[in-house]
Amino acid sequence: DVYKRQASELMVALQCGGSDALSGVTANPALGYACDLLVAQGGTGVLAETPEIYGAEHLLIRRAIDDATGKRLIGLIDWWQDYTARNHGSMDNNPSPGNKKGGLTTILEKSLGAASKGGTTPLTGVFKYAEPVTARGFTFMDSPGYDPASVTGQIASGCNLVTFTTGRGSAFGSKPSPCIKIATNTEMYERLMSDMDINAGAMLTEGQSLEEKGREIYDMLLTVASGNPSKSEA
């Protein structure tokens, strides 16, 4: 039997790992465009990894639907700053060695790319780790920057699909929510084609537009939600 469901029932985790210099140029903005399309249909996007929006949090705070929502996000950043200071660390200890090999230079550069996964719509809610996401639209969930831990929280919060952009490459997959992998560059996509669902590098190598790639990602969300397996599931 076939059961029809609305796109508004989708809650999508917006995740990245193994970022490179093209993450903020191709895959992440394209995912942000797809998130906007999803939100327009009544669906929900859930951004996470609080330490990895450090330095770009103002771009999200000014999109908050009200002062209370913006202040909740500020509170999360303040907590992580205090936590790292108490443990003799700092919030600017990113990017990782792999990020640097991929061309990222500072946490600010990395954060600008990470934040772009959230598109352009208002920030409707800010939630604790694994707290049920009760708002519709673009939301944020507190989590560490470690991908498996972050995605686990997003799934526990209610995400029934996971989108995962990567530039350096990643073998990450998830259950019970399917994971759609998006490559930032064509070289890596061709090398890991058996594990990548979408090549956002085609925006550079084939001249595809942001809108075209964003629509492709959105269509893939619907395809996988309809039962077709992603590469991580195959």
List the predicted regions and their residue ranges.
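Short, small-residue-biased leader/transition segments that mark boundaries at the very start
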Residues: 2-3
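Anaerobic metallocofactor- and corrinoid-dependent redox/one-carbon enzyme cores
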Residues: 9, 14, 20-234
